């Protein structure tokens, strides 16, 4: 009986170590200038003589040529019109973009894009399940892309366009 507890403790300790290392690996950069807003989930920011391409985590906004794509981009421009943000970087994607969460005056911009109905929760990559509550409210109130009951998530749109 005792031998069955040992593997569990080992696994639990390993999971705890992985969780702690993931928290510690996040990098927080403050007061960055917005250089360019590419679309509703990608921006270029400037920090210490270097420009970073940042992909907003937890969300997937409509593609530029997709219905609501321009609206999504314009809403992100509206949110970031004052041009300075804080970024919590949690990694790098396969395209070399920094994966991050944007904050403007303490406001979570990634979450705001979902709350306003200009981005979906990115099912395959979401780690903060509370984003689904924001999405449900936006859908119920028919905000942004939820005005169209046939809206297609970007990941499906991209598959269809291949």
Where are these regions (language model features)?
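Small beta-barrel nucleic-acid-binding modules, primarily SNase/OB-fold domains
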Residues: 2-18, 22-162
């Amino acid at each position: 009986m005792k031998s069955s507890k040992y593997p569990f403790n080992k696994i639990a300790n390993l999971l705890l170590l992985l969780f702690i290392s993931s928290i510690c690996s996040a990098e927080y950069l403050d007061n960055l200038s917005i250089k360019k807003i590419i679309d509703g989930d990608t921006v270029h920011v400037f920090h210490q003589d270097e420009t970073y391409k940042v992909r907003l985590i937890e969300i997937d906004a409509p593609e530029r040529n997709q219905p609501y794509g321009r609206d999504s981009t314009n809403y992100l421009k509206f949110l970031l019109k004052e041009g300075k943000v804080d970024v919590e970087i949690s990694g790098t994607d396969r395209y070399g973009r920094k994966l991050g969460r944007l904050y403007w005056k303490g406001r979570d911009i990634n979450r705001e894009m979902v709350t306003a109905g200009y981005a979906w929760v990115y099912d395959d990559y979401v780690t903060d399940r509370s984003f689904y509550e924001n999405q449900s409210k936006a859908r119920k109130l028919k905000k942004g892309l939820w005005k169209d009951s046939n809206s297609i998530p970007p990941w499906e749109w991209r598959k269809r366009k291949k």
